[in-house]
């Protein structure tokens, strides 16, 4: 950080004794606002960077231009702009490494707060130190869409994904479907909770849960695996025994529909397909 003037200079500038200057610097150093380096002088710490409001809010999402994200970002921007704040956009592509890089960059800039969608939120976070540094620097943050397992006590805004997965599966069961396949994302909290809702609805409908009727995919294979797995089921392993598919989201549902149609099945006459979001 910026180097402070000498004790003599500060004493003359503020017309106080050197002893008073030393006491003031000691208090600031103790609070973490200053760092004294032997032989070099006293410097402002990173905390000083955030001591004055910048009216900048960082918004970190997994994606920017795909799927629902443009609408989410637009909604955030409308509220922030109305309150006199500017938005600083970052995206992680659901990568832990990129998330850590975004947080490091935020810590080096004048940012008043952070709205962040955690990457692969079902997996233990290994860069907790960066979130702790936000707190040390008095930068408030809120998690959206997901929450790391060890951060349940931090501010977060989540959908009720369990209830959503439950309701959509119950709807299919109530309409007579008995062979309901599920397609869920394994590395995000949303996918795990939607799957739990799916399981609960099957139990209540007295439909046996079959792990062979559940497709799990990850961020890296999200555009390939659901399509390939459903096509394999429709063409071989479950041919004639699949009457509905509960999908993690609408993007996944589009892949599932294409796979089923390429196997000669009609939607919804032969197989009902549900989306989410």
Residue positions per predicted region:
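Short, ordered loop/turn segments at secondary-structure junctions
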Residues: 39, 92, 119, 146-147, ...
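Short, flexible, glycine-rich and Lys/Arg-enriched loop motifs at helix boundaries
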Residues: 48-54, 117-131, 218
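N-terminal helix-turn-helix DNA-binding module of bacterial transcription factors
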Residues: 1-51
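Phosphate- and divalent-cation-binding pockets in alpha/beta enzyme and binding domains
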Residues: 43, 68-71, 197, 255-256
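Bacterial carbohydrate/catabolite-sensing allosteric modules
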Residues: 31, 78-86, 105-112, 125-277
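Amphipathic helical "hinge" segments at domain boundaries
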Residues: 49-113, 120, 199
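The beta1-alpha1 cofactor-binding region of Rossmann-like NAD(H)/NADP(H)-dependent oxidoreductases
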Residues: 7-8, 96, 162
């Amino acid at each position: 950080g910026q180097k402070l003037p000498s004790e003599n200079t500060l004493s003359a500038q503020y017309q106080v004794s050197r002893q008073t200057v030393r006491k003031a610097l000691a208090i600031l150093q103790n609070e973490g606002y200053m760092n004294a380096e032997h032989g070099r002088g006293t410097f402002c710490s990173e905390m000083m960077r955030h001591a004055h409001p910048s009216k900048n809010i960082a918004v970190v999402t997994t994606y920017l231009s795909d799927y629902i994200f443009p609408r989410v970002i637009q909604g955030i921007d409308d509220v922030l702009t109305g309150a006199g704040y500017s938005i600083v956009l970052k995206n992680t592509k659901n990568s832990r490494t990129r998330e850590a890089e975004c947080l490091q960059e935020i810590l080096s800039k004048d940012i008043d707060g952070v709205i962040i969608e955690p990457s692969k939120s079902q997996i233990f976070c290994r860069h907790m130190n960066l979130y702790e540094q936000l707190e040390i620097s008095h930068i408030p943050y809120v998690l959206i869409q997901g929450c790391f397992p060890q951060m349940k006590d931090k501010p977060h805004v989540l959908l009720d994904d369990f209830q959503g997965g439950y309701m959509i599966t119950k709807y299919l069961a109530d309409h007579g479907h008995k062979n309901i396949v599920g397609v869920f994302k394994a590395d995000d909290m949303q996918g795990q909770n939607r799957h739990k809702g799916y399981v609960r609805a099957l139990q209540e409908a007295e439909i046996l849960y079959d792990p062979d009727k559940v497709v799990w995919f990850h961020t890296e294979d999200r555009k390939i695996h659901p399509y390939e797995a459903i096509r394999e089921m429709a063409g071989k392993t479950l041919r004639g025994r699949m009457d509905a598919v509960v999908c993690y989201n609408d993007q996944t549902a589009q892949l599932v529909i294409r796979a089923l149609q390429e196997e000669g099945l009609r939607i919804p006459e032969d197989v009902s397909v549900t989306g989410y979001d």
